[in-house]
């Protein structure tokens, strides 16, 4: 069994400004840096075998901070990348009046089926690459929700959103 510490990246400048980040790099703000340091402190004595991050800067930075006390490298994978929000990327979220109605969304947004397929691929990859190990993975709000949706075999809307720098444990 692989034990997964699933973490969402620390707070970013765009989180605060309510900008749809999607697959943009993003930068941690002061609070986000502090959140990552708090997770590092909380887990510094946990025997974690590997650290994995999305290939987006906000997650890499969070993961590097958490991994530092363990003196371990961070492995990067695009499987943990946030949902591609297409034409919504970079937009002010409150201005997206049709956000609650997917039928009205632009056609270039990554589908739920596609993101869940990526989440399933990530879980399979972890089981293969890190059998019987403890792995900390830093991702994003929607991909982390998709991973949990696949893991628990529940619709994504039944998975509670993760706060910035929140940790959830999954036994794979």
Predicted features by range, described:
Residues 53-54, 117, 138-139:
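Short beta-strand scaffold positions
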Residues 7, 11-72, 99:
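Active-site-proximal alpha-helix that buttresses catalytic centers in soluble enzyme cores
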Residues 45-47, 126-134:
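Glycine-rich phosphate-binding loop signature in dinucleotide/nucleotide-binding domains
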Residues 12, 143-144:
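Short active-site segment of divalent metal-dependent hydrolases/proteases
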Residues 68-120, 124, 160:
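Phosphate-handling substructures
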């Amino acid at each position: 069994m692989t034990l997964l510490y699933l973490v969402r990246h620390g707070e970013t400048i765009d989180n605060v400004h309510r900008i749809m980040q999607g697959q943009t790099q993003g930068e941690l703000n002061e609070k986000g840096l502090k959140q990552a340091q708090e997770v590092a402190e909380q887990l510094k004595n946990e025997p974690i075998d590997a650290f994995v991050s999305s290939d987006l800067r906000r997650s890499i930075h969070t993961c590097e901070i958490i991994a530092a006390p363990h003196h371990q490298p961070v492995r990067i994978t695009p499987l943990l990348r946030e949902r591609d929000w297409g034409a919504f990327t970079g937009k002010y979220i409150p201005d997206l009046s049709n956000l609650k109605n997917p039928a009205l969304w632009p056609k270039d947004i990554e589908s739920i089926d596609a993101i869940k397929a990526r989440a399933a691929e990530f879980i399979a990859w972890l089981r293969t690459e890190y059998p019987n190990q403890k792995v900390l993975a830093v991702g994003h709000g929607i991909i982390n929700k998709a991973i949990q949706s696949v893991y628990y075999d529940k619709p994504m809307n039944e998975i509670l959103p993760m706060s910035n720098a929140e940790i959830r444990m999954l036994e794979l």
